[in-house]
């Protein structure tokens, strides 16, 4: 039977389902023990990780029987994908599985910031009712800038349409025609910084995107949404 190591927390129902098909070793804290991974990974056919487990070359070089790595999420920056590619180890992220949840989070956070919900809640708990001292803003009429135009950005787009929001996007891999089909205008990175009231980032972490947002980028942004 195929033997799988799970190195981080996983939902009980999901674990039960996996146990029906495979021999599973569930060690939710294994991600913290690099020595364990280096010594024990050779006995497994597959590994399931989240974002905390680092599977670098020093660990993978010991994985003589490893055939696949399942990533519960979409980011692959914690896995040496180049080593996996060169050694016929399949790496499978859960692409799109959390798109709805992330999109809802983006809209919720945008509304929370514009409506200053946290500040008002804190004041209310103190027995105050800041009806005039705290000024809030509407999402309606704002310009939303999307960095990356994949599954999650499209989900965000669907949710904000009801707020009469204008959406612009930057993605070097998506054409203007493709964006126009979604009623989105393709713009440059700098244009998003200058135009957008809200910026939402949906790109993988890699050498090209690491440090994409630094001090000089924040300086270029609008100071008020």
Predicted features by range, described:
Residues 31-35, 50, 71, 93, ...:
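Residues at secondary-structure transition points
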Residues 22-29, 46-48, 123, 175-182, ...:
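Short, flexible loop segments at the rims of nucleotide/cofactor-binding pockets, characterized by
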Residues 132-223:
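Rossmann-like dinucleotide/phosphate-binding beta-alpha-beta segment
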Residues 87-89, 94-143, 151, 158-162:
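Phosphate-binding beta-alpha-beta segment of Rossmann-like dinucleotide-binding domains, i.e.
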Residues 15, 34, 56, 103, ...:
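A general structural signal for well-ordered alpha-helical segments in protein cores
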Residues 1-91, 194, 214:
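An N-terminal-biased, well-structured beta-alpha scaffold segment characteristic
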Residues 77-83, 117-129, 164-168, 173-175:
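Mobile beta-alpha loop/short-helix "lid" or hinge segments that flank ligand
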